[in-house]
Amino acid sequence: MPQLDPTLVKVLADGDVERANREKEQGPALSIFQVRDHGALLAIAGEARNALLYEIGNPVTASLMTRHRISAALYAPIRVVLYENDVGHGVFEYDQPSTTFGQFGDQRVTAVARGLDAALARSLLRATE
């Protein structure tokens, strides 16, 4: 999964709708916005382990939800934790987007979130290969 293209952020800030729509059609379904090393935080508490929190999403896709329910911005980007479990295996954990965004009771938002379910599942499967 690629890092979020910083030029896309500028495109959105500038209101370049044509370029944003092109990005929606041709760009990656999901990008990494930020990575936080929670394992380092655990090490401070004497519980060292591998644990990364990824914030991933697509700003254009997020806008398709927030235009109907601005409070959907509370949950975009999506957060995925990749951590080492007690027996040393890597585990992905996340809230399913359609469930999280479904709380708003707006079918337009939920429909976009179902697309995120599929994109997230594809991305995580690719990451395990």
Task: Locate the predicted segments by residue.
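Cytosolic covalent-transfer regions centered on His/Cys nucleophiles
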Residues: 1-75, 86-90, 97-129
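Short, low-complexity Ser/Thr-rich regulatory SLiMs
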Residues: 80-86
